[in-house]
Amino acid sequence: MYICIAKIEKLTVKENISTLLAEKCVGIAGAGGLGSNVAAALVRSGVGHLVIADHDTVSRGNLDRQFYFSDQKGHPKVYALQENLQRINSATRLTLFYGRVTTGNARQLFSGCHVVVEAFDMAPEKEWFALWMTENLPHIPLVMGSGIAGWGLSEKIRVQRSGNLYICGHQLETNEKEVPLMAPGVGL
């Protein structure tokens, strides 16, 4: 993500990074294991505005790898995440959408972003969103996660780039029974 922003701005001076990040807007499609943790990292890094979209609610099964707490069970993820992010940095502007991202609303949600992170759980959602972004908002870098929800294999994580599409992960198929969904991979 930071690579995308830095390439957009051709940054060379470290002191400019804080100012640059404070002026940027990052969209996050999905507020689960990847999206909630990316949001926390971006807020801690000083990104000025996040657009976060998700249709799900916090459940007990989310607590081992997502940036939520047990007292937030049953709450919409975007609102629970807002509460948590504001505790990190209340100056960060948050635009929230509680609902499914669709071809009918994706442009309205993400066209004002400098970078968008695809953080959906399911492969079909990832696929349509990547195709939609590259066809409809090709000027906006899209960062996708693939195969990073477990543990181990961290030495195989790579970034593959094609135009404004960045795919981060090891892109290997793993069996959830052998490598369960856990926080370590997402934290990388």
Give the positions of each predicted feature:
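Adenine nucleotide-associated cytosolic modules
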Residues: M1-L188
